[in-house]
Amino acid sequence: MSKATERDLIVGLDIGTSVIKAIVGELLDDDSISIIGVGTHKSRGMDKGGVNDLNLVVQSVRQAVNEMELMADCSVSSVFMSISGRHVQCQNESGMVPINNQEVTQDDVDNVIHAARSVPMAAERKLLHVLPQEFVIDVQEGIKNPIGMSGVRMEAAAHIITCAEDMAKNLVKCVESCGLSVDQTIFSALASSYAVLTDDERELGVCVVDIGGGTMDMVIYTDGAIRHTSVIPLAGNQITSDIAKIFRTPMSNAEDIKIKYACALKDMVSMEETIEVSSVGGRPARVMSRHTLAEVIEPRYQELFELAYEQIKASGLEEQIAAGLVITGGTAKMEGAVEFAEEIFQMPVRVGKPHSVKGLAEYVDDACFATAVGLLQYGKQNINNKRTSSKKGEESVLKRIQSWFKGEF
């Protein structure tokens, strides 16, 4: 069994409320990712993105990681981990600094981003992301990459995402209890956007709605940058609960019924179609109309989509989402979900599946793997950025040494 250090491997760990997914990918010479191992396990001990039984979460994570390692024939030591929950918050901030040498360098960019992130933050909050939106040099606005440009002062606008420190610590503790370290904690919807969006969609304006089991995570892009993020603590598990209660069937059976037979729009289902529903307490199974099932599910999807639509309107970005909506996550796959969403949002809607991966791509060609694959894409960018910074640092040291020699001799 090879170790991650012997190969250029990245691991994504999506600790969801319903399912835990672990994916390992190998960084190839052409800067693409080849997926070499996938592991999934039913999530236990999680509720709406938070840990409510640490030991159960540890067991579930260990099972998913072991399955992934077995498939990939490798041993991993660290992961890029997702996080969600209503405790995740966002804000847009700005910072300003003078340009040191009249020409913008990477140090100037780092300084202005640091100025933007230097906002008062409660002790119980953890900074997850500082995502630059655009730069202003003197009077020139809308600059995407300011390096090399001339000016006196520079301003940066940035989107800041934070979470509850304790929530993040509990998830990290679960991962570390499995003998792994966490490279970085990433907001779930941000990771999903890396997996399912195109550059054109980001530029035109797009909203990603990641509908999982416990939470519905959202991120809005306009002009190539993130402008708004939010989490709604309601998602697919509520639909399963509705089915279980109304049809008086166990939760496990309700989940199976949802996956196999459910439809988000009752008008798309024939009145003649029937399904068999197991009963509780040893009672005989019953035959129910699939149309009746859709009548139960449709109001819940309407609630979910209307809550998401309220978030879009509250952001003030509704008119800027020209590319429409991308729904992803396990709950986005249901028949009728796209059609129903188009009715409510009055904009184009598609289901987002991971793209731009090689290797075992067929294993993850599914909306429920959006976050896990996105963690690999995010991790790749993170690694490339570190390598670029390290290379620039080495070049800077070399230049200083050369200057010293010139001065001495």
Name what the model sees in each region.
Residues 218-219:
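A structural feature that tracks compact, well-ordered secondary-structure segments
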